[in-house]
Amino acid sequence: MPAYNPSARFDKAPFHSSLFQYCVIPKRLGVSGRRQVRNHMSIDNYVIGDQVELHEATSSKVKKVSSNHRTRFTQGVTMRILITGGTGFVGFQLIKLLSSHELLVLTRDLTKAAQRFAHIPSQNLQLLSPLDELSDFNGIDAIINLRPDNRLPINAEEKPKAGIARSRLDITEQLVEKIRASAHPPAVFLSGSAWFLCDQQAACL
């Protein structure tokens, strides 16, 4: 596989937009019948991989984007990608999909991560804990942030909404600080989240 050339990558990038967000729903992820939970990633830049359904979300409609562009900018190149929360439900599937690239995976539990990713060649995987092991993000092509605390309470009193929001903001702020400290920052930053639908929405949010 040829080396990745960042200077040639974004000349005609198909998905860049400051006005829209994109919902990326891995085909293999379903909906829980009991809790009616659907996972998604909100993306405001680019999308990696060919096993996704890509939709452009607007206020009035959802329009499917042509699948011809899904992997146009990653075909035939090796990228260096930082992924946070790689041992989670979405992250684990994503890492399997991107295993041919050079992956840096930020995880809370190095032992658990090493076991889950034993099938990935060691030269393609570097496990990190904590993020401070990296002083900056020079040489990293993309960041995929999947690390927010998704262990939601049974009811809002057990963990206030502000705490849930903070769990999603802290890691993002740390990543942004290191991006700013980089002379050659990553060209792509993706940040994931999830929505929850149930009969008593107040208890889920």
UniProtKB/Swiss-Prot annotation:
InterPro entries reported in the protein's UniProt record: Epimerase_deHydtase, NAD(P)-bd_dom_sf
Similarity annotation: Belongs to the NAD(P)-dependent epimerase/dehydratase family.
The protein's name in its UniProt record: Protein Rcp
Annotated source species: Vibrio cholerae serotype O1 (strain ATCC 39315 / El Tor Inaba N16961)
Lineage of producing organism: Bacteria, Pseudomonadati, Pseudomonadota, Gammaproteobacteria, Vibrionales
